[in-house]
Every structure is written in C-alpha cells, then in structure tokens.
C-alpha cells in the first residue's frame, strides 16, 4: 500500500472516531425545533428559546417571568405528564405537518407519540403567540427564579 493511501485511511479512521464521540441530539427535540420554526414562520431562531426566562431550556423553577416563559412551563409540565404515562418525550419521534396555519400532528396511532406531538405543537403555537422580551434571555436564574 502506498504511504499516501495510509495517510488517507488514517485520516478517515480518526474522523470516524471523532464523530462517534459526539452525543446524538434526541430526535424529538430536533422535531420540536422544526415545529417552532413552522409556528413562527422562521421569524426567530430556535436557539433564542433555549435559555429564556425560568423554564425555557433545561430544567425550570420559580415563577415564569412572562407569557413566553409560561409557555415553556406548560410544555415542561406536559412532558412530565407524558413521563407519568410511561412515555419518553425527548425520544418520541412522530409525524407532523407544517401548513399555512402552523404545525399539526398527523397519522399518529401510538398513544405516547400522539401525546408528545400534541405537547410540542401546542408549545410551538404558544411560542409564536407570545411576545419575546430580549431582557428575559440568559437571565440570572438564581436571582429571578426562586
């Protein structure tokens, strides 16, 4: 084998090892981001919702700071109800449709998938209706979310 071929083979192997160490994004959260984009017609990137208020993003505590944060709390509570039913909301893939009037769940026969899709669609529509206050992005949750 030629030395150049060995270098290419080595580079491919190293690349594959690096890719294998990247944790996968739960499929449902990817779908949820698409639903948000569908509901708000692409007017705000989904990362704006990952660290907003007391409930948008990982975890949550205290009193929601505004209407948008209440949408996130309701979504968190909905996922909590899904877990009580034995569902895995962050891993449940489902079929949805993005129409002129926003996202809809479609052709879902399994109870968990339907429940989680409904949680996500309602949250995405709530996000689209709620005003976005830049002052509530990346807040100090230790002070404001008691």
Swiss-Prot record:
The active site is at 75, 120. Transmembrane segments: none annotated. It comes from the Eukaryota. Expressed by the venom gland. Residues 20-27 form a propeptide. Residues 1-19 form the signal peptide. Binds 1 Ca(2+) ion. Its cofactor is Ca(2+). GO terms for molecular function: calcium ion binding; calcium-dependent phospholipase A2 activity; phospholipid binding; toxin activity. PANTHER family: PHOSPHOLIPASE A2, PHOSPHOLIPASE A2 FAMILY MEMBER. Belongs to the phospholipase A2 family. Group I subfamily. D49 sub-subfamily. This is Acidic phospholipase A2 S5-32M. It comes from Austrelaps superbus. The lineage of its organism: Eukaryota, Metazoa, Chordata, Craniata, Vertebrata.
């Amino acid at each position: 084998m030629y030395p150049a071929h060995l270098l290419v083979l080595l580079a491919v192997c190293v690349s594959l090892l690096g890719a294998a160490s990247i944790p996968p994004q739960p499929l449902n959260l990817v779908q949820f981001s698409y639903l948000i984009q569908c509901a708000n017609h692409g007017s705000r990137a989904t990362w704006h919702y990952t660290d907003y208020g007391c409930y948008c993003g990982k975890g949550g505590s205290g009193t929601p700071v505004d209407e948008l944060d209440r949408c996130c709390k309701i979504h968190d509570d909905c996922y909590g109800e899904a877990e009580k039913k034995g569902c895995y909301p962050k891993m449940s893939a489902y079929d949805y449709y993005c129409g002129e009037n926003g996202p809809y769940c479609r052709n879902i026969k399994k109870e968990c998938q339907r429940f989680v899709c409904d949680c996500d669609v309602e949250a995405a529509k709530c996000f689209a209706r709620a005003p976005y206050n830049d002052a509530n992005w990346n807040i100090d949750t230790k002070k404001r979310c008691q």
